Amino acid sequence: MKVIKTAPLIPSEIKVLEKEGNRVKISLAPFEFGYAVTLAHPIRRLLLLSSVGYAPVGLKIEGVHHEFDSLRGVTEDVSLFIMNLKNIRFIAKALVGQDSSLENQSVVVDYSFKGPMELRARDLNSEQIEIVNPEMPLATINEDAQLNFSLIIYKGMGYVPSENTRELMPEGYMPLDGSFTPIKKVVYEIENVLVEGDPNYEKIIFDIETDGQIDPYKAFLSAVKVMSKQLGVFGERPIANTEYSGDYAQRDDAKDLSAKIESMNLSARCFNCLDKIGIKYVGELVLMSEEELKGVKNMGKKSYDEIAEKLNDLGYPVGTELSPEQRESLKKRLEKLEDKGGND
């Protein structure tokens, strides 16, 4: 029998459909028509932006003064060493379980390696540190050479450029960009489900994959908890009558557009392709049409697909339509970054 409702149906079912390694598929149901996507998209964004991970943000190498130095007795120069280091995913054991509301949680680890050896991520395991992708290469140390270095590893979320960590560094340390998010992929599907014979209800199926720093199901629960806390503020205090700021590029949901393309963790081929035409910021990619991106010199299908996937994960698919005001505001913000040399 058809009824006229005065309140939406409350979802009552959450199931783990698949769990393998660092990947999980979760279903939530039932939702009123239109409610599923309303909730699924912000949960996806929070998984990408608010999941807590670990990253090295400070590096000190004995005998090295800046990132453009060479490493004596090591095949890789400092720049390549840093790039390899950023591909390694850490877990700082001492910081696991600590209150995430505490700021500037970090550990310092010291390393010393003597050649000849092929230094890999697994060699960085210690009482303080666990490596979740142990086979990643780091450096090739030649015979009779020694490599001594120290890392400062922070607990954090999202992407933090080196400009923002410089003041945290002790003397002698080089600041590094910190890519903290442990989420490799999160997508969702909306399906129709029957409720008492009515097919006009919906189910969300999340497919979440992490890099191993955090269990994917725990990451999902944490994102839901963050969302609940963010919305809970409206029930706890009166909403102030403040004026809305129309500058799109200053809003929180556009902040990641001013991040450097290094934050996208692109392959070397993709990065070099964009670097050669002067693309430095994510926002510059968002402003490009599909045709413009495909028309970039040496942009093959594989590279295009990789960039498209990364932009989609950020919530800005290739060819995202922005209003004229949004485009103009974003362009001004990017120009401002260029004038400041990348410091926002």
From Swiss-Prot:
Pfam families documented for this protein: RNA_pol_A_bac (PF01000), RNA_pol_A_CTD (PF03118), RNA_pol_L (PF01193)
Keyword Protease attached: no
Disulfide bonds listed in the record: none
Protein's GO biological process: DNA-templated transcription
Recorded catalytic activity of this chain's protein: RNA(n) + a ribonucleoside 5'-triphosphate = RNA(n+1) + diphosphate
SUPFAM superfamilies assigned: C-terminal domain of RNA polymerase alpha subunit (SSF47789), Insert subdomain of RNA polymerase alpha subunit (SSF56553), RBP11-like subunits of RNA polymerase (SSF55257)
GO-annotated cellular components: cytoplasm; DNA-directed RNA polymerase complex
EC number from the UniProt entry: 2.7.7.6
Gene3D superfamilies from the UniProt entry: 5' to 3' exonuclease, C-terminal subdomain, DNA-directed RNA polymerase, insert domain, RNA polymerase, RBP11-like subunit
Region described as Alpha C-terminal domain (alpha-CTD): spans on this chain: 254-344
Top-rank taxon, per record: Bacteria
Subunit details: Homodimer. The RNAP catalytic core consists of 2 alpha, 1 beta, 1 beta' and 1 omega subunit. When a sigma factor is associated with the core the holoenzyme is formed, which can initiate transcription.
Annotated domain remarks: The N-terminal domain is essential for RNAP assembly and basal transcription, whereas the C-terminal domain is involved in interaction with transcriptional regulators and with upstream promoter elements.
UniProt xrefs under NCBIfam families: PRK05182.2-3, rpoA
HAMAP family named among the record's database cross-references: RNApol_bact_RpoA (MF_00059)
Name assigned to this protein: DNA-directed RNA polymerase subunit alpha
Species of the source: Helicobacter pylori (strain ATCC 700392 / 26695) (Campylobacter pylori)
